[in-house]
Structure formats: structure tokens, C-alpha cells
Design a protein with these regions (language model features):
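Hydrophobic helical membrane-anchoring modules
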Residues: 1-32, 55, 188, 212-274
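Short beta-strand/loop segment that forms part of the nucleotide-sugar
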Residues: 37, 60-70, 97-98
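Active-site beta-to-alpha loop of glycosyltransferases that engages the nucleotide-sugar donor
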Residues: 37-51, 69
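Acidic helix N-cap motif at the loop->helix transition within catalytic regions
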Residues: 44-48, 72-81
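Short, acidic, metal-binding catalytic loop of nucleotide-sugar glycosyltransferases
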Residues: 51-60
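A conserved acidic beta->alpha catalytic loop
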Residues: 67-76, 131
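Acceptor/aglycone-binding surface of glycosyltransferases and processive sugar-polymer synthases
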Residues: 93-94, 99-118, 123, 135-219, ...
């Protein structure tokens, strides 16, 4: 039943500056963490994103780009960038998963996250390639995950301290808040940013969820994954972030994705009641 969810385990980390990047204990900084970054026509954004991530004081961080055969050459750009980023032991800090079928953001994430866990990541971070998610918050999110034992840490736009880009108009901001309230109300959760895509998962949580069982192809993947984590009693923490608008390229949101996002919470609720 929906009411059986462990809502007390949905909590927020103390509010902090959206640009904060606290130093981690050395052992924590070396924790195997893989950033999974789906791409489609992100040639203009990817080089800058790679430099930001590789410049973080997180020796354990690896980047897995999941490219859906981008016609603008993003996949080859990713391969070229990977050659220039090696760990101290000579192993690559960046790799590329090439997919031949463009069948949705959710499926790209699922493929990348499964590979990351298979390759030994202790934590997996979902991150957009368009610069909307703040790389400066990754260390803080990892620290929260490791200090609390949370299965999921959400980079949240809607907890105290979280903010949205000024480039978003009032209509877009209202629509985003409505989408969060819509999904959370139907599913009976108190996660403030259930639709957000900047999420850090423990490998344990991902194995328990079983990525192959996730049915969402598009953006509703974010909602389905969080709901499944709560159903399995994993603690969910939320850390405030500032969400930027992309400056290069176009959004991949389309009508089919929007319709799936409307229908998916009802499907998840119906399955939970069986």
C-alpha cells in the first residue's frame, strides 16, 4: 500500500550555500564514484563539463558518458577527451558507452548506471551534460551519503537553500513545482524534488531496485527510481542546489515524454497497491 512507505526516512540535509564544496576526509574522497552522463548532441557542452569534473578534488571520481549516437559527433569528442584523463595508476578516469538506439533518457541512465555498478562503483551520480547541475556540490552529496548511510542523496531545487535559474520564467518555475507536487501527492511521498535529475545512489540501492525492472523511458525515470528506493526503505536525503538553465543546445523534452510523466505516477501507485 502507498501508506506503507517509510516517509520519516525522507529527510533534508542542513541547508547550505549552493556553491559549497566542503573538503572530504581523504578516504572518502577516494571512494569509487561514477558520474553517469547521458548525451545526445552535447558537443558544445561536454568539454567544459569534463574539465569541471576532472578538476574536483575527488580522486575516486570516474565519468561514464552514455552517448546515443549523437549526429553532432559528441561520442567521438567524448572518446578524445577520455584519452587525456588518466588516474595516477594509468587507468582511465573517463569512458564512453555508445548506444545505437535513442530510446529515452531513462534507458540511457539505466544502461550507464548498471555498467557503473558492474565496474565496481560504490556510488553512482546522475548528472546532465548541459551544465544545469552544479559540480561543486558533488563532494557535499558524497559526504552526506557516506555520513548518513543514505541510499539516495537528491540535489534538490526545492528544499531550503535550493534555487532555480533566473533564466526560467515564472510559468516554467510554476510548472516545475506543479510537476513535483503532482507526482509526490499521487505517490504519497515527501521528497521535495522527486522529479529532479541530480541524484547520487549507493550501489546497494541500485542493486535492490533492479534497474532492468524500471519501465520509464523518459524523464519519469527520476520519479520511478525514487519511488522504488522509498518502497525498499532506503533513506533519501536532499541537499540544496542551484539549478542553472542550459546555455548551449536544446532541451530534449517532447510531447511523448510529457505524457509519460503524467501517466507514470498513476501506474506506480496502481502497482504498489497490488
Amino acid at each position: 500500500m502507498i501508506g506503507e512507505q517509510k516517509t520519516p526516512r525522507e529527510t533534508s540535509a542542513p541547508a547550505a550555500s549552493a556553491t559549497a564544496s566542503p573538503a572530504l576526509p581523504d578516504a572518502w574522497a577516494h571512494t569509487p564514484l561514477t558520474v553517469v552522463m547521458p548525451t545526445y548532441n552535447e558537443a558544445g557542452n561536454l568539454p567544459g563539463m569534463v574539465e569541471l569534473l576532472m578538476g574536483l578534488e575527488l580522486p575516486g571520481l570516474r565519468l561514464l558518458v552514455v552517448d546515443d549516437s549523437s549526429p553532432d559527433g559528441t561520442g567521438q569528442i567524448a572518446e578524445d577527451l577520455a584519452e587525456g584523463h588518466l588516474a595516477e595508476d594509468g587507468t582511465p578516469r573517463m569512458s564512453v558507452l555508445h548506444r545505437t538506439t535513442k530510446d529515452g533518457l531513462g534507458r540511457a541512465y539505466a544502461a550507464g548506471m548498471a555498467k557503473a555498478v558492474e565496474d565496481g562503483a560504490a556510488y553512482v551520480l546522475q548528472m546532465d551534460a548541459d551544465g544545469s547541475h552544479p559540480s561543486a556540490k558533488i563532494a557535499e552529496m558524497l559526504g552526506v551519503a557516506m555520513s548518513t548511510g543514505a541510499g539516495l542523496v537528491v540535489g534538490s531545487r526545492y528544499v531550503p537553500g535550493g534555487t532555480l535559474s533566473d533564466a526560467w520564467g515564472a510559468h516554467r518555475k510554476l510548472l516545475s513545482r506543479w510537476a513535483n507536487a503532482y507526482a509526490s501527492t499521487i505517490l504519497g511521498t515527501r521528497v521535495r524534488d522527486i522529479t529532479g535529475g541530480f541524484n547520487m545512489w549507493s550501489a546497494e540501492a541500485l542493486r535492490a531496485i533492479d534497474l532492468a525492472s524500471v519501465g520509464s523511458a523518459g524523464y519519469s525515470f527520476q520519479v520511478e527510481m525514487k519511488f522504488k528506493a522509498l518502497r525498499r526503505d532506503f533513506q533519501v536525503m536532499e541537499v540544496p542546489i542551484h539549478f542553472e538553465d542550459r546555455t548551449v543546445g536544446e532541451s530534449k523534452m517532447n510531447l511523448a515524454v510529457q505524457l509519460e510523466s503524467i501517466a507514470m505516477p498513476w501506474k506506480l501507485r496502481a502497482r504498489a497497491r497490488r
